[in-house]
């Protein structure tokens, strides 16, 4: 498999899948990303959405911590009003780095997790989470909704109902 670049699947909202289907897809994605990171030691890829991998399925993986995070049919349930800007790259747009805005924190519901997952930092609650992980999860969930990082540039950020 290879990462899709100029493919209409990247601009399409992905189909919901069963947890078993999602796990099978995620295994292939994790294997690909780990092998790719091992081969390209200078550049670490942090996440991958199924549609980038050529599969119309609402599945994403994030490789920031020791164990890969798998999200099947993820949906952002809550998010901070506060946003931060940082540079992002994307496997589907190699060698591109752009400034994007992301929410400081998000709460995500996924079919393969019993409880909502929290990513980011709630300054008002002294919760110093990982804002990089929050940004990567937002980036990958956006892919599953047919959005790319170009849609999150400071002057083109989508409204919450587009998530």
Task: Please provide the spans of the model-predicted regions.
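Positively charged
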Residues: 1-163
